[in-house]
Regions:
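Catalytic-pocket segment enriched in acidic/His residues
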Residues: 2-21, 36-45, 112-199
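Extended, compositionally biased flexible segments
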Residues: 1-101
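Generic beta-strand structural signal
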Residues: 48, 78-80, 101-105, 133-135, ...
Length: 199
């Protein structure tokens, strides 16, 4: 059966060495860094990370971030992006990493003033988290070339000034556990691994 209108192009991310990775869903995982979980009133030893979604169209590998409208307070958090090529029900933990196609560095942009307003009104945060170009992402690096990093520095600088610095080893829920919580293929899981030093 034919579409009645032309379907939109498939969102995708560039791959180091060439090619594109198609993206169907983007799951974001918060409170995955102990200090940040405590700061947000959670218990890092008990509470699993919560999930929310960004629109795949919000992914942006252009290297530019136009300041969004309707906000005077945009915050940034550097993240680890995990690209999944497979998914399914009841994936054994020991096989979870087989679902991972590659990794990238990403940034979660938040219109913090709109988020605070939504919290006060007990409304969803979507307007603060899911907006155009709210998920800058670097090029994907295949796991076949770098393996599955469990540790390693991840940093963010603004105009040359270091704003975030940490190590992947500081994540409460490791990639293998986060992969097991997600059952979709052609997805990107953006895992919070750091606390923003200036927030």
């Amino acid at each position: 059966m034919r579409y009645v209108i032309d379907p939109p192009p498939t969102p995708s991310l560039p791959v180091r060495g060439g090619g594109l990775f198609p993206v169907r869903r983007v799951y974001c995982i918060g409170r995955n860094y102990a200090a940040h979980a405590v700061e947000m009133g959670g218990d890092p030893n008990r509470e699993p990370p919560f999930f929310f979604q960004k629109n795949p169209d919000d992914l942006d590998a252009s290297g530019r971030f136009p300041y969004p409208r309707r906000s005077r307070n945009v915050h940034h958090e550097v993240e680890l992006a995990v690209a999944l090529a497979a998914g399914g029900e009841d994936i054994p933990v020991e096989r979870a990493l087989e679902c991972v196609w590659g990794y990238a560095v990403a940034i979660d942009m938040t219109r913090r003033d709109l988020q605070d307003e939504a919290k006060k009104l007990q409304r969803p945060w979507e307007i603060a988290k899911a907006f155009a170009r709210s998920a800058p992402v670097g090029e994907l690096v295949p796991a076949s070339t770098i393996g599955h990093p469990a540790r390693g520095a991840i940093t963010l600088a603004v105009d040359g000034e270091l704003r975030q610095a940490g190590d992947l080893a500081q994540m409460i829920w490791k990639v293998v556990g986060l992969t097991g919580l997600n059952r979709s293929r052609a997805s990107v899981v953006v895992a919070e691994g750091l606390r923003t030093s200036d927030q």
